[in-house]
A protein has these predicted regions:
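Short catalytic/metal-binding and nucleic-acid-binding patches
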Residues: 1-181
Length: 181
């Protein structure tokens, strides 16, 4: 692990001696982040009557189309679950789009949020913000982390008590090979 600041790299040996508790602090950070995310997810799952139900069939259709719109152009979908008041979405950004331009996470999220907000607001005959400004994104670092992220995403409707098997939830998608999770 190294740190980059203003295009200057701090040598690993110096980083370790200057901050001997770095690994401990890193583990505390990840532990607190995990607890925060769990508490946030629990709050979302407990809200049974959201002002806009994303899992209504028409809203789910809008979201499914949007989540697949950039497939093969800017991203590869691995899994998603459309819950009544939030979405879990695991995807891999491509380095470049079909025109050879770099692909940025914020551009994909903004595009999906803008389009789905417009369409769902129209369907629900409402105005205003549909999505929170903040999204909780996580960088997946290896295959094990990817496996657990997909499993967590697919099983979210089960954990929320909405179905007994994730395959029974209409707003859930799992990539090929996800059937046994």
């Amino acid at each position: 692990m190294g740190a980059a600041i203003c295009n200057r790299r701090i040598p690993e040996s110096r980083l370790k001696t200057a901050t001997p508790d770095l690994e401990k602090l890193k583990m505390q950070y990840y532990s607190l982040r995990k607890k925060y995310m769990k508490a946030f997810d629990d709050l979302l799952d407990a809200e049974r009557l959201p002002s806009v139900n994303l899992s209504k069939p028409y809203n789910t259709k809008i979201l499914v189309e949007a989540l697949h719109f950039w497939e093969g152009k800017k991203l590869v979908n691995h899994a998603y679950s459309i819950m009544p008041n939030h979405i879990h979405w695991v995807f891999e950004l491509l380095e470049k789009d079909e025109d050879g331009k770099p692909v940025y996470l914020q551009d994909v999220l903004q595009s999906v949020k803008r389009h789905t907000a417009s369409q769902i607001n129209k369907a629900e005959v409402i105005t205003g913000a549909l999505w929170q400004k903040e999204s909780f994104d996580t960088t997946i670092r290896d295959d094990k982390h990817l496996y657990y992220a997909i499993r967590y995403t697919l099983n979210n409707p089960v954990s929320a008590g909405l179905v007994k098997d994730w395959k029974d939830w209409p707003g859930t998608f799992g990539c090929d090979g996800c059937g046994d999770l």
